[in-house]
UniProtKB/Swiss-Prot annotation:
Gene name linked to the record: rsmA
Keyword Lipid metabolism carried by entry: no
Protein name: Ribosomal RNA small subunit methyltransferase A
Major location category of this protein: cytoplasm
One GO cellular component term noted in the UniProt record for this chain: cytosol
EC numbers, comma separated: 2.1.1.182
Catalyzed reactions per annotation: adenosine(1518)/adenosine(1519) in 16S rRNA + 4 S-adenosyl-L-methionine = N(6)-dimethyladenosine(1518)/N(6)-dimethyladenosine(1519) in 16S rRNA + 4 S-adenosyl-L-homocysteine + 4 H(+)
Entry GO MF terms: 16S rRNA (adenine(1518)-N(6)/adenine(1519)-N(6))-dimethyltransferase activity; RNA binding
Source species: Xylella fastidiosa (strain 9a5c)
Keywords assigned by UniProt, alphabetized: Cytoplasm, Methyltransferase, RNA-binding, rRNA processing, S-adenosyl-L-methionine, Transferase
């Protein structure tokens, strides 16, 4: 069953695929479980398929939308339901901390992310995890599989390690192409990310950690001795208890953290 609010053609330049299937809309709302007074921020509200049910539950909501043509009809549809604040900007330029007012609840992020820039958006919000309670995103299933992949998996990579270091990542359910208008060529999936307690992460230098993960998976067929030759010495590996002939996909997230924290003495 389709649920379309207004006739706004999808724009390929924005990577738009509007969710229109009521069954999957309801499943997503149930997964989010919105509560009154939740501080929800939606990335890419589109035609409001998720926006309006959330607004009805919470009374207010902030949406970040780049497509100017969607703002007026979305505002009109939202007016009877509650207070909708729309930020007309690229989400990659938005500092979410300006939305997290002192004393307020942490932000809850939701969104059907444009597939062409989903990874940059994930890394952008990851940098602001301290002010986020949880995130529910719809992405290309292939990306969701990479996000939740365990060590040893063929799709375990930089995205897996970086997200799992800071968040608990859960794959919720798959959404087929025919739930969208226009339908994408691939399956989508809903993922839930819950930022970890910062006191349990214990990464001494986040830049060094990021550099090590990037370099290790940038040459994933090489042993870590070779792929990290410019970053880690034998002493780093010894102190972290990691074999130099191991490859990136064999390391647990905690082992990458140990290697980043290891001393060169």
């Amino acid at each position: 069953m389709e649920s379309q609010l207004f006739n706004a053609p999808a724009k390929k330049a924005f990577g738009q695929h509007f969710l229109v299937d009521r069954y999957y809309i309801d499943r997503i709302i149930h997964a989010i479980t919105p509560q009154p007074n939740d501080h929800i921020v939606e990335i890419g509200p589109g035609q409001g398929a998720i926006t309006l049910p959330l607004l009805k539950c919470c009374g207010s909501l902030t949406a970040i939308e780049l497509d100017r043509d969607l703002i007026a009809p979305l505002t009109a549809a939202a007016t009877p339901l509650g207070k909708l604040d729309i930020i007309h900007r690229d989400v990659l330029t938005v500092d979410l901390s300006i939305l997290a007012k002192p004393g307020n609840k942490k932000l809850r992020l939701v969104g059907n992310l444009p597939y062409n820039i989903s990874s940059p958006i994930l890394f952008h919000v990851l940098q602001q995890a301290a002010i986020i309670a949880d995130m529910h995103f719809m992405l290309q299933k292939e990306v969701v599989d990479r996000m939740a992949a365990p060590p040893g998996s063929k799709v375990y990579g930089r995205l897996s390690v970086m997200l799992q270091a800071w968040c608990e990542v859960t794959t919720m359910f798959v959404v087929p192409p025919d739930a969208f208008q226009p339908p994408p060529k691939v399956n989508s999936a809903i993922t839930r990310l819950v930022p970890r307690d910062p006191t349990t992460i214990r990464i001494a230098d986040t830049k060094r950690f990021s550099d090590i993960v990037r370099a290790a998976f940038g040459q994933r067929r090489k042993t870590l001795r070779n792929s990290l030759a410019d970053i880690c010495t034998p002493a780093h590996f010894e102190h972290a208890g990691i074999r130099t002939n191991a490859r990136a996909e064999q390391l647990e997230v905690t082992e990458f953290i140990a290697l980043a924290n290891a001393k060169d003495t």
